[in-house]
Amino acid sequence: MKKELKKQIVEELSKEFTNEVCVFYADFKGQTVKDLEALRKAVREAEGKARIIKNTLARIAFANNGIEAEFEENNIFIWGEDQITLAKIITKHAAANKDTFKIKGAVIEGEVKDAAYVDEVSKLPTKDELLGMVAFMMKAPVAKFAWALNKLIEKKESE
């Protein structure tokens, strides 16, 4: 790869990794093209990006943003703003491809995290699920109050 192309890639990644909240990385050794395409499709649907990047270029891009990270072997980098949804996608992919896809860690809000952290994040509810829970909790007392009023009205009408 030419030096100018490498510089361009590093600049692009530095901007991406600055603007994005989280970057996951995983070993994809042994993955088929079909498996990687399925992962990329799922990531795109979650408005994220997935790309195989040379470790040195990724390390420099992170260093440009003040993050010290070391990468070994083959890595696919997955990044986007919705860290919980992306964590769920890659954890599900890792479970379905245990021998060929291993989550190594993540860089979330400027901190390097391990694979166990990614697994814990994947168990959290997504933003949409949380909003649904809040809406349900807000609706429940109103529904109970309306039910009580209806029973009171029925009782008054029957008297």
From Swiss-Prot:
GO process annotations (BP): translation
SUPFAM superfamilies, A to Z: Ribosomal protein L10-like
Keyword RNA-binding: yes
Any single GO CC term annotated in Swiss-Prot or TrEMBL for this entry: ribosome
Keyword DNA repair found: no
One Pfam family this sequence matches: Ribosomal_L10
Function of the molecule: Forms part of the ribosomal stalk, playing a central role in the interaction of the ribosome with GTP-bound translation factors.
PANTHER family xrefs: 39S RIBOSOMAL PROTEIN L10, MITOCHONDRIAL
Record-given protein name: Large ribosomal subunit protein uL10
Organism: Nautilia profundicola (strain ATCC BAA-1463 / DSM 18972 / AmH)
Gene: rplJ
